[in-house]
Each structure stands twice: as C-alpha cells, then as structure tokens.
Amino acid sequence: MECFVVPVSLIRYIVYMRFSELLLKMGLPFLSLLVSFVCNSSPTVSDRPNIIYVMADDLGWGDLGCYGQKRILTPHLDQMAFDGVRFTQVYAGSTVCAPSRSVLMTGLHAGHTRIRGNARIPLRPEDVTVAEVLKKEGYQTALIGKWGLGEPGTTGIPRKQGFDYFYGYLNQRHAHNYYPTHLWRNETKVALRNTVPDEDGVGGGVSNNKLDYSHDLIMDEALGYIHEHAEQPFFLYLALTIPHANNEARSQGMEVPELKAYAELDWPEPQKGHGA
C-alpha cells in the first residue's frame, strides 16, 4: 500500500493512499488524482478510513514546489509530498471542467461518461458516482466547492448523486466568480454580501463590492465538516476553483483578496493572482 501523509491539526492520525485501491476493492474502477485517507483513532488504517479528496482547477504538477517549481510558494502542498508519496503518473480525465469531474465521479473514460463538454448536461439517476458507492459502505458523504455536474431542479444535483451534504457552486460559470452574490447549501441559496452588477443567469460576472471571498467560506465549511465528522467514516470531496481565473474578469484574471508576496514582483497582474 502506498501512503501520502499531510498534517491536519483537527485529526490525530492521517494516512494517504491511492483512491483507486479502495474503489477497486469495492468493485468500481477509478482514475486517482490525489486523495487523503484520515484515520481518527488509530495509527493503523481501518477498514473504513476517512477520505478527503482535493481537486483544484487549473493546478498543474508544474505549479508545485515539490515537482521542482521555484517561483510560486506552495509550502503546505510541498509538505504533503515530503511526508508521503509524490505521484508521477496521474492524469485528469479531460482538459475542461465538467467532463473531468464526470470522469472523476463515475470512474468512466471520457469517451463513455455522459458529460463530455461544458454544455451544462446533468448526471442521470442511473449514473453511479463514487459518493454512492461509499455511502453504501457506511460513509457520510459531502461535496464542498465546485460541482458542475447538475444544476437546480435537475437529476444531477449533488444530493441526488450520493452526497449527503453540499456547499458551494453548482454551475461552472458561477464558480468563475470568487465574489458571487450567493453560494448553495444543499438546494438552498445562501446570500452573500457581494454585489455583481452584470450577473448572468447562473451567478457569473464580476463583483464591484467584494466583501465575501468564496474560497474563505468554502475552506471554513470544509474544516468545520472535518471537525464535526471526525469520529465517523466520511468522504469529503473538496473541489476548489482556485487557481482558475475568473473568465468574465478578462484581463484581471484571478480574483484574490490580496497578492501577498507577489504584489511587488515584476509579473503581469493575472500571474500575480495565480501565484497568490
């Protein structure tokens, strides 16, 4: 068994292994990207370890210090690699958002999964997701972040696809906006303080009153979920939009609260935001 370890202060023991090994054991083939298995009471891996699967948009292996990159600071991810296993042959299911997520969730090849582009097609009731498989094995299941596989009123919303809990974005374009007017908690809109004068029908656009940064809220929600469910087997799919740019912001690129160490560098503004 290969392990990949990262320190998390809320959990006593953390053990990382290849996601595909567990899913193949359960009878579902799967392409693994990066996954954490979290044991909450014993240093040995239990039959049902807690699972945190982190997915980040537009983050390539060449963006991380642990693969030799020296311009962008990624100390926490580098520590994960140092403490565990650094994968060298892992591939995304597609080059764009929705089909890549569909491959990830269903374990199907991009040529066989229902969703093959960003045309807002939802998953069907008969599609089997990893969340459904794990739920049958006694796991609590949660998606926090970006979904993109089904919008309000469709068969593809997270709680119809095996997830007990959802917080974040349903629509791809909505997820471009880091200061949206709302996020979703299950099937309920959660209003935020931001204003978006040119907001489209799904929540995309550019805010002119940036008060609530979505990914601060998403990470707070994720940490709260881990803390609340630490004593029971859970699967947390943490799907982050960062470092994807806000496409609707055009030349502004990545929207971040502050540029931090990159503010004074002689870089184009989008690259500063990407680094931050």
Write out the residue ranges for each language-model feature.
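Sensor of tandemly repeated, compositionally biased sequence architecture
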Residues: 7-9, 36, 146
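Solvent-exposed, well-ordered amphipathic alpha-helical segments
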Residues: 2, 35-38
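Bacterial N-terminal signal peptides
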Residues: 25-36
